């Protein structure tokens, strides 16, 4: 019996170390950033069992077998659709401004189509303005409405949007609604999901959270897009979830969320429609390719229209493109670069690009909330401040609530607006969307919004920052080490 237990003990020990060695080898064989690999290895060696379970659950990008098969199957028809779209030559821009040229070329070569022109844009800076405009558009819809959100939180004006959507469905408008399972858990636990389905709306719970399948699909891969398409010619996107900030997370101690959305009319709605089509097919298996732009209903104004590229990220989409776009934007800056983000945990490459821009004389400003709803990200963000300040970057800490806007403005002409936070999760993992806009008029509108944010912010004083307590520095460095995993 003693011999039996001895053999079993040695087999357990051998299996334990073989498991650690196997996971270590897998991490080393994967082509990932060195800081990320080192962080995972540290966790595995300090807390082996916890680290191994965490890595198998969250360390690699698993979309799930069924979704991965759908993603592969959809691309032949999607590629044909994109090729057919190229025949609509009147919607594509032939040239761009000097500051936007490199980024638009990158997007065209990675995605296969050029930026689309002739779009009309309107910036909406309050949730009330967004929802009022949306309700009007829903009431005037004639054919179809598609929506996707990370969070839909019942209450306040969000309920008015829901009522208008159900009314549209009852009068014959084809309505589709896709919501992330984790972000919209309150919605799916409320009566609203059933009420909408009873009204004829197709409601899809995207990327369902199922702990029994934790090793088969990465649970923290989320559908983070916020998009609305109406009749294939009106579109919305930006940072706002379908929530009324007067009722959303009021106990978090950060104040109301401050967001920005863009309302668009024009062929950009078609470009966003193909993104939605891909998401819908990956999740449901149903193909809903949008029709090509209709020149009879879309004003392709070459002089006053805005030129836009739509960048989508996530499994099945061009890898690393949003990250490349941000790097290209930073390196294209000649006069000034302004960024707004709620969560700032950049890659080493992006941090280097931002600091280099400041060091070569570009006026670089980053606006982020003073109080953050994520303690982990809040501390990790602070770990980058010293390097940013040393390079000459201005850091503005917004004090008027939780600034949730995600925007970049380069030299007053090149703008990026969408759902992407400047953190690893948005850059490498989630389903995200960003608009790249080449237009000085829109740039002026965005600059006015960013100036308003700055007027409600406090400029971080470098001389005071270096005097912060030692315990804060230690905490910052601790979270900095694990920042590749946040």
UniProtKB/Swiss-Prot annotation:
Entries under InterPro entries matching the protein: Cardiolipin_synthase, CL_synthase_A, CLS_N, PLD-like_dom, PLipase_D/transphosphatidylase
GO CC, any one term: plasma membrane
Residues annotated as domain PLD phosphodiesterase: 219-246, 399-426
Location relative to the cell: Cell inner membrane
TM segment ranges: 3-23, 38-58
Record-listed E.C. numbers: 2.7.8.-
Family in the record: Belongs to the phospholipase D family. Cardiolipin synthase subfamily. ClsA sub-subfamily.
Reported function: Catalyzes the reversible phosphatidyl group transfer from one phosphatidylglycerol molecule to another to form cardiolipin (CL) (diphosphatidylglycerol) and glycerol.
Protein name per the record: Cardiolipin synthase A
Species assigned in the record: Enterobacter sp. (strain 638)
């Amino acid at each position: 019996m003693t011999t039996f237990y001895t053999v079993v003990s040695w087999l357990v020990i051998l299996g334990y170390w073989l498991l650690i060695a196997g996971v270590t080898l897998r991490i080393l064989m994967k082509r990932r950033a060195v800081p990320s690999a080192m962080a995972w290895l540290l966790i595995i060696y300090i807390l082996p069992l916890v680290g191994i379970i965490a890595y198998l659950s969250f360390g690699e990008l698993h979309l799930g077998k069924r979704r991965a098969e759908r993603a592969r199957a959809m691309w032949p028809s999607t590629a044909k659709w994109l090729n057919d779209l190229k025949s609509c030559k009147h919607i594509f821009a032939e040239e761009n401004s000097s500051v936007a040229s490199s980024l638009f070329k990158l997007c065209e070569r990675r995605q296969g189509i050029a930026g689309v022109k002739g779009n009309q844009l309107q910036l909406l800076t309050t949730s009330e303005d967004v929802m009022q405009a949306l309700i009007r558009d829903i009431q005037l819809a004639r054919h179809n409405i598609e929506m996707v959100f990370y969070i839909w939180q019942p209450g306040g004006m969000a309920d008015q949007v829901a009522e208008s959507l159900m009314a549209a469905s009852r009068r014959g408008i084809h309505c589709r609604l896709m919501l992330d399972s984790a972000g919209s858990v309150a919605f799916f636990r409320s009566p609203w999901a059933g009420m909408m389905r009873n009204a004829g709306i197709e409601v899809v719970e995207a990327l369902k959270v199922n702990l029994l399948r934790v090793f088969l699909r990465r649970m923290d891969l989320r559908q983070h897009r916020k998009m609305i398409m109406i009749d294939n010619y009106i579109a919305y996107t930006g940072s706002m979830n379908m929530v009324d900030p007067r009722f959303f997370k009021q106990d978090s101690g950060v104040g109301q969320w401050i967001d920005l959305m863009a309302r668009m009319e024009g062929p950009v709605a078609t470009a966003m429609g193909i993104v939605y089509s891909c998401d819908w097919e990956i999740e449901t298996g149903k193909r809903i390719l949008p029709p090509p732009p209709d020149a009879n209903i879309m004003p392709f104004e070459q002089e006053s229209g805005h030129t836009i590229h739509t960048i989508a990220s996530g499994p099945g989409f061009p890898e690393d493109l949003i990250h490349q776009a941000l790097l290209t934007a930073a390196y294209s800056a000649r006069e000034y670069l302004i960024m707004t983000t709620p969560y700032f945990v950049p890659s080493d490459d992006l941090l280097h690009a931002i600091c280099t821009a400041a060091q070569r004389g570009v006026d670089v400003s980053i606006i982020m909330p003073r109080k953050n709803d994520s303690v982990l990200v809040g501390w990790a963000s602070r770990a980058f401040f010293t390097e940013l300040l040393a390079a000459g970057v201005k850091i503005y800490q917004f004090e008027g609530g939780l600034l949730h806007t995600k925007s970049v403005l380069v030299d007053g002409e090149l703008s990026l607006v969408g759902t992407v936070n400047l953190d690893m999760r948005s850059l490498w993992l989630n389903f995200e969307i960003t608009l790249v806009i080449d237009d000085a008029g829109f740039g002026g509108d965005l600059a006015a919004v960013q100036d308003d944010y700055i007027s409600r912010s406090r400029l971080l004083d470098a001389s005071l920052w270096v005097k912060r307590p030692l315990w804060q520095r230690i905490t910052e460095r601790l979270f900095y080490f694990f920042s590749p995993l946040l």
